[in-house]
Amino acid sequence: VVEAASGIRFGEFLEKRLFGPLGMEDTGFFLPYEKRERLATVYESVQEQKLKPYEQDHLGIRISACPNPFESGGAGLLSTADDYFRFADMLLNGGKNGDIRILEEETVRFFTGCGLDSKRQESFSQWFGLDGHTYGNLMRILTDRKLAGILGSAGEYGWDGWLGTYFVNDPVRKITLIFMTQKKDFGTSNLTRKIKNIVFS
């Protein structure tokens, strides 16, 4: 849809409208050769308490000499903690990066507002680690702190990636937490929850 509406590739659109204005110089679907030594190794569990490097292609996450032909709206970006913070901070500031307007405030409210009916909420609640949350139009939203069993504020929002990239914005406390691992299927793990509780305590 983005490519049809804009007339350019999805990655180019993100660079022009989001990454560039936010100064996210290390974010994209393709990792240039000169930056590859900075890339963290991805791991997977092979036995309890043991890891090995993950070498498969999944969700468009791959490192090759050629740009990925499929630029997904849900996976495949490479980034850094600093760049991710710029994105999260823009959302926390209602769509602004300093004096630069990236998204309209109404758009940010739409992204971070509740969007599930009762049937879909029942299905969403079965995801591991997301008790006490709902899903908005972009990410998870905390609705019941006691049910979630975590510290935080009702209305906080964020998401986690398949390799354990986790972020949360708390608009009440004005806190952003970014936690990055490189392990497949890490998601909203117990470790992530413990770290969040430490930071928010």
Sequence positions of predicted segments:
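Generic C-terminus detector
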Residues: Q182-S201
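Extracellular/periplasmic catalytic domains that process cell-envelope and extracellular macromolecules
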Residues: G132-H133, N169-P171
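Short, structured beta-strand/loop micro-motifs enriched in basic residues and often containing a Trp
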Residues: G158
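Short, small/polar residue-rich loop motifs at catalytic or cofactor-binding pockets
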Residues: G161-L163
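Short, well-ordered beta-strand micro-motif
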Residues: R140-I141, V168-D170
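Short, well-ordered beta-strand elements
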Residues: Y166-V168, K174-K183
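Short, surface-exposed loop or secondary-structure junction motifs
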Residues: V1-L151
